[in-house]
Amino acid sequence: MKLPLLLAIVTTFSVVASTGPFDPEEMLFTFTRCMEDNLEDGPNRLPMLAKWKEWINEPVDSPATQCFGKCVLVRTGLYDPVAQKFDASVIQEQFKAYPSLGEKSKVEAYANAVQQLPSTNNDCAAVFKAYDPVHKAHKDTSKNLFHGNKELTKGLYEKLGKDIRQKKQSYFEFCENKYYPAGSDKRQQLCKIRQYTVLDDALFKEHTDCVMKGIRYITKNNELDAEEVKRDFMQVNKDTKALEKVLNDCKSKEPSNAGEKSWHYYKCLVESSVKDDFKEAFDYREVRSQIYAFNLPKKQVYSKPAVQSQVMEIDGKQCPQ
């Protein structure tokens, strides 16, 4: 899919600003999440989606477009909603990490344009209108730099290979293949892991960190994003009140070792009073993580039997018999 203009930054649900630089998977997640959270229902949904995919931020007077734009800006760090200022530092970080994706003079011009933007009230319309002229003037530069150019991104996916979650690959499968590769003695452990057995060894903790960060339950800064967990519960029509209590309890016992936080929260949820709801939500997240655009053309209706069937199919693929 052609990623939409760099202009956007999303707003509803969790709005955890990521830490750059960003790889193609991270930007794909950002753009599709911002689309999902802001697309209108009804006859305008598909035409609007088609434009956003082409980096055309229209209709410009639509609250949906404006909030989509703000969402991307916030998630990438181009706009700080707390300071209510634009910040070009991520542009330089991105160029330093991916120098082949831009020309130095054009990147500097883009960064200067962003840095010169005035303080702006933290609302969708104001942020969108402030950034839109910069987007239009530097669209090609930002599109290339933030992995919106299909051809450039294709080359990066090929270069990174097994070191990045590939398109149409679930993040669970990516992590499983990374830490329990096919043909290795460790592969058999997936038969237990995929049935929610919590292991206590270093390898499993690394694997869990990979998954929990991949589905954004844990941020790059090793912080719990409770809103992301709650979002998945709502996707399977589960009440979040009991979940909130469980997460608060888990938080009170959070380890100081950053490397064990993902494992701690996973174990805490799997062994909690909401474990069945968590497993159901987690399974559905696995299915949806195969296609980040899962809910874009239209919001999908959750079907537990269908998800169970899909997960069993993945089990058969990942767990050697």
From Swiss-Prot:
Keyword Disulfide bond in annotation: yes
A Pfam family matched by this chain, by name?
PBP_GOBP
For whether the record's keyword set contains Disulfide bond, the answer is yes
Q: List residues binding noradrenaline.
A: 176, 194, 207, 283, 286
Q: Which SUPFAM superfamilies match?
A: Insect pheromone/odorant-binding proteins (SSF47565)
SUBUNIT field: (Microbial infection) Interacts with envelope protein of dengue virus type 2.
Swiss-Prot/TrEMBL domain comment: Lipids and biogenic amines bind independently through different binding pockets, with lipids binding to the N-terminal pocket and biogenic amines to the C-terminal pocket.
| Name this polypeptide is given | Long form salivary protein D7L1
